[in-house]
UniProtKB/Swiss-Prot annotation:
Lineage: Eukaryota, Fungi, Dikarya, Basidiomycota, Agaricomycotina
Similarity-based family: Belongs to the ATG22 family.
Localization of this protein: Vacuole membrane
Membrane topology field: Multi-pass membrane protein
Organism: Cryptococcus neoformans var. neoformans serotype D (strain JEC21 / ATCC MYA-565) (Filobasidiella neoformans)
Name this polypeptide is given: Autophagy-related protein 22
Length: 571
């Protein structure tokens, strides 16, 4: 397939995954939560007297478990809760930015310009951590929180813009071009023109303009959302039928889909490799400096430098659109993006596709619960177990490695069990089993409230739970997309995958805020795991109500009804 080296445009696109995912895996996921907590602790005092200054990473018995509070913006806040509040605000701002920037990211003229603007703004937010004063001041936690919010928002919006290049890059592939030529030679140009041409006025795929009006994210983002293990998992389901292309048009569409999936999966793998590699290398300076706040700031700053440095090939190699139709910015474009949300959650839609929206309801809770568990566990390890920064980094590495291993092994085990069992092991069953397994983590942690032993009281337990969570988290993401893909009306994949991505981002600010508030009120972040237990257990019966077979039929009926309504309007 083509040459051994990827084309220049693809190499430039891969370079951005290599650059940005380091900031995500290192700064956003590991170092920023710890840094915010430690910066607040440096200006904090032990409750309830609020006279003795707090100590960082002191595992002595007279300090471990004591509540540290810092006065921030005139309010005394638990230092662990402060980090959770900042995370909640950051996720909310991230969701707002993703929705608002969507229409512009779908315009070729703005796509690269926005990508570079957000990339260098985000990298700068990380580099600025190197300029903080060595001594703590009352304003340093606030400034760190602002930079955290900026980093979260710019990273997410830059990924939206980056993924918007994906379909165009797939269409440049040699095999896709050959399939296009074969299709056009059979006189199928009219039917394929909207699929192949990369314009800003036309939607990709077979989605109508009416459907395009309901998109929440750029059309070019959606194939990337679908491609990461989703299509392969959906097709590997023993109950799903693989339809071979019967003509040149289907061959072209199939080749385009496979190429999109290959590029997306390769980009994801490159991003993971760079993230884990740099995270491992950063263990050296963090360990050498004793896990101090300066070592955390240094790691964040180096992540920002990496992001900026390896974005240069992206800046040079990615194509930039020339001024043209739609290149003029208008506030109405942002307004339209928000109007689209209301159309997607209209009662009529919910009534016609009940199983799809029941699944989305469960997904909102589960997605928030999983992501908050990751963040809360890091803060728990730092503030309650007093684990050093190098040890927490090791926890993060264990989670990511376990997630990759399980993402590879679980589909193979599923296929093996399906061939040896009388009843097939469907994607839905695997997802349900994964959710039940994930609920074990808050159950075990909450057991520490009533039992004198266990209940996540030691570092060894944290390492074991990190591996357990990683083994569950990887398949959870893949199989959630796979099950959802089975419930989507044929021909309307982009519309409903955008809703899936939106619900993932928009609701994930609730968990961090709730856990932070509980920790603030009780003085013990362990009580926050009671909330996480609810977030992971309550959706289980909701998810159990999803009837995938019936949902497939509803999706087909919805698509047929939509086509009929469009035909009637044309007449």
């Amino acid at each position: 397939m083509g040459s051994s080296m990827p084309p220049p445009h693809v190499r430039a696109w891969y370079s951005y995954a290599f650059a940005a995912e380091v900031f995500s895996a290192c700064a956003l996921a590991i170092f920023l939560p710890i840094t915010l907590e430690q910066m607040a602790r440096e200006v904090g005092y032990y409750a309830p007297e609020l006279t003795e200054t707090c100590v960082i990473n002191d595992s002595s018995s007279d300090v471990t478990g004591r509540l540290c509070k810092a006065r921030i913006l005139g309010v005394w806040i638990d230092t662990a809760s402060f980090s959770m509040y900042v995370k909640s605000i950051a996720v909310a701002c991230q969701a707002i930015c993703i929705i608002s920037i969507g229409p512009l990211a779908d315009i070729a003229y703005w796509r690269k310009r926005l990508l570079l603007t957000f990339a260098y703004s985000g990298s700068l937010s990380g580099i600025l951590f190197l300029l903080f004063p060595p001594l703590p001041y009352a304003w340093t936690p606030i400034m760190a929180a602002i930079l955290n919010i900026v980093g979260n928002a710019t990273y997410s919006t830059s990924i939206v813009c980056s993924n918007a290049f994906l379909p165009g890059l797939a269409k440049e592939d040699v095999d896709v071009q050959k399939a296009w030529e074969e299709a056009t030679s059979e006189g199928l140009q009219d039917g394929l023109r909207d699929v192949h041409e990369d314009t800003d006025e036309e939607n990709t795929g077979s989605v109508s303009r009416e459907d395009e009006a309901t998109h929440l994210l750029p059309d070019r983002l959606i194939p990337a959302v679908c491609a990461i293990s989703t299509q392969d998992l959906a097709l590997s389901d023993p109950l799903a039928k693989l339809i071979e292309p019967s003509n040149a048009k289907k061959h072209y569409e199939s080749r385009l889909s496979l190429t999109t999936s290959r590029l997306s999966s390769t980009g994801t793998a490159i991003g993971f490799f760079s993230g884990v590699s740099v995270l491992t290398l950063l263990l050296i300076p963090v360990t050498a400096l004793g896990g101090s706040t300066f070592s955390m700031r240094l790691a964040i700053g180096l992540s920002g430098v990496w992001w900026a440095l390896f974005t240069v090939p992206t800046c040079i190699g990615l194509p930039g659109g020339a001024p043209g139709h739609g290149s003029d910015f208008s506030a109405s474009q942002v307004k339209k993006a928000w109007v689209k949300i209301g159309k997607m959650v209209a009662p009529k839609q919910i009534h016609q596709l009940p199983n799809l929206y029941i699944f989305l309801l469960a997904w909102i809770f589960l997605s928030d619960g999983f992501h908050t568990t990751t963040y809360a566990a890091i803060l728990y390890a730092s503030s309650v177990l007093s684990m050093s920064a190098p040890k927490i980094i090791l926890v993060g590495i264990l989670v990511q490695l376990a997630a990759v291993v399980s993402s590879v092994l679980v589909p193979r085990v599923q296929r093996r069990l399906s061939t040896t069992s009388s009843k097939p092991v469907t994607n839905y069953k695997v997802l349900l089993a994964g959710v039940v397994a994930a609920a074990f983590i808050p159950v075990y942690t909450c057991a520490g409230l009533v039992l004198p032993f266990g209940g996540l009281r030691s570092e060894e337990e944290m390492y074991v739970l990190a591996v357990w969570f990683g083994l569950v988290f990887g398949p959870f993401l893949s199989y959630s997309r796979a099950v959802y893909a089975e419930l989507i009306p044929p021909g309307h994949e982009s519309t409903f995958f955008s809703l899936f991505a939106f619900t993932d981002k928009s609701a994930s600010f609730i968990g961090p805020a709730a856990v932070g508030l509980i920790s603030d009120l009780t003085g013990n972040i362990r009580y926050g795991f009671l909330f996480l237990l609810v977030m992971l257990v309550v959706p289980i019966p909701v998810l159990g109500r999803v009837a995938v077979e019936r949902g497939r039929r509803e999706a087909v009926e919805w698509a047929e009804r939509s086509r009929k309504e469009m035909s009637d309007e044309r007449v």
